[in-house]
């Protein structure tokens, strides 16, 4: 996955590709948040659990489509292909950064 992105997002994408929930959670601030499928996950432990559950439930591959940066916010468009209804699907991953970490991630269609 090649993408010119700030370091915390590049690290997140590498951890995502490796399916490493621990590494994903370390990309976030201590009180970082993820909003996905109508639910919020706050803190690294909750983010780790969310990532593990998503990887087990959906078994997907993420392919980057494009990215746009606006200040401390980066929107990454990704195509997810896998074992879930409606596959493939394109989703926006909206990252907000703080102190070289991800403060929040919102995933939406």
Language-model-detected regions and their locations in the chain:
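A beta-strand edge to alpha-helix "cap/lid" segment located at domain peripheries
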Residues: 35, 48-109
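Short beta-edge strand/loop motif at the mouth of beta-sheet-based domains
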Residues: 41-49
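Residue-level detection of beta-strand scaffold positions
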Residues: 11-12, 23-27, 47-48, 58, ...
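A short gly/proline-enriched turn/hairpin at secondary-structure junctions
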Residues: 31-42
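Short, low-complexity N-terminal intrinsically disordered segments enriched in polar/charged residues
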Residues: 1-26
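Flexible, active-site-adjacent loop/turn segments at secondary-structure boundaries
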Residues: 26, 39, 82
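Alpha-helix boundary/capping and short turn/kink residues
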Residues: 18-21, 37, 85
């Amino acid at each position: 996955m090649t993408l010119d992105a700030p370091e915390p997002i590049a690290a997140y994408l590498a951890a995502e590709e490796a399916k490493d929930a621990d590494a994903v959670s370390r990309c976030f601030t201590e009180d970082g948040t993820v909003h996905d499928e109508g639910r919020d996950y706050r803190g690294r432990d909750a983010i780790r659990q969310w990532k593990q559950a998503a990887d087990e439930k959906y078994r997907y591959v993420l392919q980057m489509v494009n990215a746009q940066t606006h200040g401390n916010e980066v929107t990454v468009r990704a195509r997810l292909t896998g074992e879930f209804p409606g596959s493939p699907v394109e989703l926006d991953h909206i990252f907000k950064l703080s102190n070289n970490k991800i403060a929040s991630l919102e995933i939406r269609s």
